[in-house]
Amino acid sequence: MTAGAFSDVVRARLMARSGGFCEVRVPGCWDEASQAHHRRPRGLGGSRSPQTGQASNGLMVCLPCHQHLETVERGEARDRGWIVRQGADPREIPVYRYRQWVLLDDEGGLSPAGVVA
């Protein structure tokens, strides 16, 4: 397995948490999740961090949403916790998911973040 990649166990946790639906949902979303997105990118040294391959660092997304996150709008993605800066702990960064702010854990669970947007 590539350093920082999601294991089959973690991918299963991400899919269970998402229910098979895209967790980002920008305009043009296909709804069905087909890819695992790293909130804290693996580049720039991120793949060496043990947190990179954990469920708190992942979101299940559809292709259009993944392309949006990776190429179009990094500012919005950071503001919504869909992308996390290197050095940050994804477990501590709220993410906007299904119209609410949540914190993700490494077991594939989530809890309300108490963020007022």
Where are these regions (language model features)?
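Short, charged surface segments at domain edges that flank catalytic/cofactor-binding sites
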Residues: M1-F21, G46-S56, P94-V95
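Terminal targeting/leader modules
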Residues: A3-G4, V9, P41, G46-S47, ...
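Short cysteine-rich loop/turn motifs with clustered Cys
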Residues: F6-H37, M60-C65
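Charged/polar, solvent-exposed surface patches and flexible loops
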Residues: A12-A16, G75-R80
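Short Cys/His-centered divalent metal-binding micro-motifs
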Residues: P27-S34, G43, A55-D79
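Short microdomains enriched in Cys/His and/or Lys/Arg
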Residues: G43-L63, R80-V95
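Short flanking/linker segments adjacent to small metal-binding domains or redox-active Cys/His motifs
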Residues: W82-A117
